[in-house]
Amino acid sequence: MTPQVLTILGSTGSIGESTLDVVSRHPEKFRVFALAGHKQVEKLAVQCRTFSPEYAVVANAEHAARLDALLKRDGAATQVLHGAQALVDVASADEVSGVMCAIVGAAGLPSALAAAQKGKTIYLANKETLVVSGALFMETARANGAAVLPIDSEHNAIFQVLPRDYTGRLNEHGIRSIILTASGGPFLTDDLGTFDSITPAQAVKHPNWSMGRKISVDSATMMNKGLELIEAHWLFNCPPDKLEVVIHPQSVIHSMVRYRDGSVLAQLGNPDMRTPIAYCLGLPERIDSGVGDLDFDALSALTFQKPDFDRFPCLKLAYEAMNAGGAAPCVLNAANEAAVAAFLDGQIKFTDIAKTVAHCLAQDFSDDLGNIENLLAQDAVTRRQAQEFIAALG
């Protein structure tokens, strides 16, 4: 069997580390061509020593020099690259068959689009790619024969319970709606009066999942679920009015599909990202992920509730942006990234995140986003507007 040749973008993040864990269990199936780790030089050096990629990519020349010195000390042959163009190069290299797109935020868009243009199998963990450029990205993938496989646990669950011959038309398959589950985050039952005093340290402690800091805050505001709604809209060609969100605090049911005959098909499992990663990497077979069996005896109850927009205004803003279409999702994402970064840096309150996003969505913006240059220009404009609003908050 010829091994699949992988580029893993975001290898030092939680998704990247989980991917490498799965890859390490199947050395006969996978070969790592390139790893990209932004600024975590020491962790990336360990990964390079373990997986011997041809290339490693970091953010800038300073980090590249540090990584190169570490690798040369150990006699590693990995070539070190840096910068945004290097990400594009390793994502689109002829040797590569599959690209794990796990860079956080809109920064992951150019490399994901480059992989689509070269017809790669794209393991999509970067939801912002579809939020910011859904129409452009999916059309590019279709035009070049690129397969887009969802890594997000919710979208992967949907992917698993949709018909194998799903055409992107719900009615043809008797589907009434697609249901995304959400944990509700760490503040689901907290008094709303305490939200102004929520600290970054509290917000990054997700009750069920092991995730990075930014996505953990997004989970706490439920903006993460809002971004996933927009992602599902593009991945599954699903009209906004056929997408539902239900809060399920135990994170055992990862998502569901509601059918016309009254059936609801769900995918269950322990909350561990290695399951969706292994599912996509192993297609069409099921491969070992290292995840333990779901223990039904240990499950006391599975509960569900509707999301409360007063508690989660970011989810409401995401619904509005999805329904508005055009540039609104791009603006939503850019404003949120700026606001979350400011919150994590101690500049604004937890409740100011939604205020910042709402302010940016109220500004005038163009819907002419037919190319990556216009998308990135709008992204930059919105970030500037968000930063100005944040500065005015004092």
Task: Please name every model-derived segment.
Residues 1-394:
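Catalytic, metal-anchored helix/loop core of enzyme active sites in primary metabolism
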